[in-house]
Amino acid sequence: MASGGGAAFEELPHDGTCDECEPDEAPGAEEVCRECGFCYCRHHAEAHGQKFPRHHLAEYVHCAAQAWTPGARGDGAGEEAVEAPVENEKALENEAGEGIESEEDSEPEEESETEEESEDESEEDSEEEMEDEQESEAEEDNQEEGESEAEGETEAESEFDPEIEMEAERVAKRKCPDHGLDLSTYCQEDKQLICVLCPVIGAHHGHHLSTLDEAFEELRSKDSGGLKAAMIELVERLKFKSSDPKVTRDQMKMFIQQEFKKVQKVIADEEQKALHLVDIQEAMATAHVTEILADIQSHMDRLMTQMAQAKEQLDTSNESAEPKAEGDEEEPGGTDED
């Protein structure tokens, strides 16, 4: 071990070990600092070089280390060794002052950097706030548009409700389009429901008519096996036609089209029959309800008439009872006079 600059440096020479390590465990010195005069092992030499980059480290040699001691007097070496610690102290003070100045200079730079960072952060925050506001406004606009669309859809549904339209159509079908009366009669010639005025002053004058019950029973009793028979006949004719080798492809196509047209006509007739049955059944239900309502109304009229008659009889009986009561009051008075 060896002490650094000052009086201690003059008194003790280098012992060839690291001055930074513990005295008991100090390894051999490998480098020496020309400014400080301390000896270091390789590890502490690297640390010293990083801490003081302006210091010059040289390889430690025992004979060279003796030149640093005050006893080495050859060629003014002792004077240089005495002056070296003083110069080293001045160099350390200068470096410390420069470090303080550099720290002071770095503080404004750091402050300016922090100010710039704060300004950048404030700008970023303001931009984020603007984006959030725009997003919130866009969401509100979307919500308003969705609400308006929903309201428009509800209004459209209420205005164009298919069930309401179907019910209106059914009610309109139950009335005669020419006279506005209930459809209570069936025209056999036109296969159509009519009202009671159509055969009198309408287009069905002189046509064969029937009641709804008669028309319903007649249509229902008709044989509905025409479609089945037509399909069986179609299959048989197709088999027979396809087995004929003289029939060409074009002839076969034409034959199939003609046969299917016949089947389609049978299907249309069956469809029309089913629709007539539904219309007649609905008209019968309407007529039945109308009859029930008419019966209820006539019953109510009879009840009202009976109530009026009962009230009239009650009034008459009250009027006839008043003179009798007056006569009874006069009779006791006459007996007193007698």
Swiss-Prot record:
Q: What's in the keyword line of the UniProt record?
A: Coiled coil, Metal-binding, Zinc, Zinc-finger
Its cellular-component GO annotations read:
cytoplasm
Q: Where are the annotated segments for Disordered? A: 1-25, 72-162, 307-338
Q: One of this protein's GO BP terms?
A: regulation of gene expression
Q: Which Pfam families match?
A: zf-B_box
**Gene3D superfamilies annotated for this entry?**
Classic Zinc Finger (3.30.160.60)
Positions the record marks as coiled coil are 109-153, 257-322
Query: Which ranges are annotated Acidic residues under compositional bias?
Result: 95-162, 327-338
Q: Which domain of life is it from?
A: Eukaryota
**What GO molecular function annotation could you give as one example from this UniProt entry?**
zinc ion binding
Name the residues that bind Zn(2+): 176, 179, 198, 204
ZnF region ranges: B box-type: 171-212
Function field: May play a role in the process of differentiation and maturation of neuronal cells. May regulate the activity of TRIM17. Is a negative regulator of PAX6 expression.
The UniProt subunit note reads as follows:
Interacts (via coiled coil) with TRIM17 (via coiled coil).
What this protein is called in its record is Tripartite motif-containing protein 44
